């Protein structure tokens, strides 16, 4: 349900999407279009939400985002670049860095914090899908308007495939 006032500039949001009889995403809050820059104030709950829907957001920085997410977070602020606040647990997750030609699975459940415009990865055990080398990932992936992306990632490893490109002159 999304209901608007008579001005059609403010909306109450009460939304859910069921997948296989599980409410995989629900959102409750408001959208406000009364100012030049629309605002959002929504609480979101994910339960076994398929992450592959987010792959297009990563464009050429991240791809093949996969796995399922569960957790709660809020979206507040300007609609095009809201602040996020919350925590997610990822299962059977992984992602690819096309520029590095590397693809990783997250071993076990992974904890990801949402803070501002950043996704905070917390001591995640990585396994590269090509050679099965391992390492630990911590750091942030930050966006601006879900368009400009930056990585601030630390990888602790004695043996993890970091770059898998061909040498060209």
Predicted regions and their residues:
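Interface amphipathic segments
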Residues: 1-169
